[in-house]
Amino acid sequence: VSCADILTMATRQFDNVYYKNLQQGK
């Protein structure tokens, strides 16, 4: 696993959490 892969996974996780929070905020 390369650093780029870890960064991509972390970003994806953050996007998922952020999106869920956005949906709940409505």
From Swiss-Prot:
Its main location: secreted. GO terms for cellular component: extracellular region. It is found in: Secreted. Keywords: Calcium, Heme, Hydrogen peroxide, Iron, Metal-binding, Oxidoreductase, Peroxidase, Secreted. Transmembrane segments: none annotated. It catalyses: 2 a phenolic donor + H2O2 = 2 a phenolic radical donor + 2 H2O. The keyword ATP-binding does not apply. It comes from the Eukaryota. Binds 1 heme b (iron(II)-protoporphyrin IX) group per subunit. Coiled coil: none annotated. GO terms for biological process: hydrogen peroxide catabolic process. Removal of H(2)O(2), oxidation of toxic reductants, biosynthesis and degradation of lignin, suberization, auxin catabolism, response to environmental stresses such as wounding, pathogen attack and oxidative stress. These functions might be dependent on each isozyme/isoform in each plant tissue. This is Peroxidase 1.
